[in-house]
């Protein structure tokens, strides 16, 4: 493993552990972004299960023929995830950005989730 990958993995693990300690039992909204798509899921760490998930790979997102790697796709994923979480009765989460900066697609997803009813 290269030094950059090791450092990135350590940072990601550190962020996740801090959130689990300070989460107070709230579910965790975890974000993963690749060069072509963005994924998000609401995870209950106490039970070890995923409560809701959404990604730019879903058929409803791909109908526009646009890429899943832009800010508009991130906003749509955030909105969809918040709706699915609300169906499961989840209103409060802890935001887990992993090793990604709170900027661009990650920020757009978080803002859209907040506007759609999730609080964090």
From Swiss-Prot:
Residues covered by region (Disordered): 1-26
Ranges of biased composition (kind: Basic residues): 8-23
One protein family per Pfam: Ribosomal_L18p
Keywords: Ribonucleoprotein, Ribosomal protein, RNA-binding, rRNA-binding
Ribonucleoprotein in keyword set: yes
Function according to Swiss-Prot or TrEMBL: This is one of the proteins that bind and probably mediate the attachment of the 5S RNA into the large ribosomal subunit, where it forms part of the central protuberance.
Similarity comment: family membership: Belongs to the universal ribosomal protein uL18 family.
Name this polypeptide is given: Large ribosomal subunit protein uL18
Protein encoded by which gene: rplR
